[in-house]
């Protein structure tokens, strides 16, 4: 298995030299580096295909949907093939770039700001899984899952089985799930558990997010809220990273990967500590 945490520059370079470039994202924004790289690849004759979500969740004003339509129009003008998942299509939440046998998986939507975690894998099983997912068929190979429900089970297992007495988790969205259950079990068992979630998830009182967080606070979990919106976990000598939010385990295309490489786990730990330091204690009252 060959998995490493990489910067966005490596993804852009891969797109820049690739002959066959396939992309899945929830949203992309005009002018961002990855969009410009895709335009350049299509312009020079590479085969570029992109799949975006056509009806993003919690998009009451339609801004994300309009943004995706604008990106689709722009990419098509350069010769790329773009699909917008509609009401009858399986939702697109997987963030992936597949270029000539290398899969780049992001826990966010390849933002230009760099506040994301990207893993690159050349493992033939991983690459085959990502390719199948981009074709609409989810699966798992023991450490990588391309369906949300399975990805969250992988994360929950890492939380339960991680050695030591510290568990750190970040998720943009949060609710009752295998992850919340595993966190509660570890906290009640005496582990020091920290959880970081997106502040925007707590805008409305009486939500599932608030109820799930209240239960964890009662169990002794330390909770903060922030704006980094990453999705990762560190538990002892193992970690997990993905684009799957720790919410209801739906059978949708997404991704999550368990990692044991010391360098990758260290990178996840560094990302968590940076995000944690910038966050603030949760206030549910």
Residue ranges and their predicted role:
Residues 169-174:
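Long, repeat-rich segments with strong aromatic
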Residues 271-285:
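Charge-patterned, long linear interaction tracts outside catalytic cores
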């Amino acid at each position: 298995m060959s998995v490493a945490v990489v910067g966005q520059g490596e993804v852009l370079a891969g797109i820049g030299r690739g002959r066959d470039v396939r992309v899945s994202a929830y949203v992309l924004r005009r002018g961002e580096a990855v969009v410009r790289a895709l335009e350049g690849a299509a312009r020079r004759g590479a085969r570029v295909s992109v799949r975006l979500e056509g009806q993003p969740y919690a998009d009451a004003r339609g801004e994300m949907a309009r943004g995706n339509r604008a990106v689709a129009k722009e990419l098509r003008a350069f010769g790329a093939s773009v699909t917008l998942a509609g009401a009858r299509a399986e939702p697109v939440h997987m963030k992936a770039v597949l270029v000539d046998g290398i899969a780049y998986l992001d826990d966010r939507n390849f933002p230009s700001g760099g506040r994301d975690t990207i893993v690159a894998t050349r493992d033939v099983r991983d690459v085959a899984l990502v390719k199948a997912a981009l074709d609409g068929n989810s699966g798992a190979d023991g450490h990588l899952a391309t369906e949300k429900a399975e990805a969250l089970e992988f994360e929950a297992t890492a939380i339960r089985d991680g050695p030591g007495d510290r568990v750190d988790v970040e998720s943009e969205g949060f609710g009752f799930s295998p992850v919340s259950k595993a966190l509660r079990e570890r906290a009640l068992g005496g582990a020091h558990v920290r959880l970081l979630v997106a502040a925007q998830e707590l805008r409305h009182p009486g939500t599932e997010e608030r109820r799930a967080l209240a239960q964890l606070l009662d169990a002794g979990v330390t909770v903060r809220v922030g704006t980094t919106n990453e999705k990762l976990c560190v538990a002892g000598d193992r970690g997990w990273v993905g684009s799957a939010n720790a919410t209801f385990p739906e059978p949708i295309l997404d991704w999550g990967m368990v990692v044991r490489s010391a360098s990758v786990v260290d990178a996840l730990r560094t990302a968590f500590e940076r995000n944690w330091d910038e966050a603030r204690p949760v206030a549910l009252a």
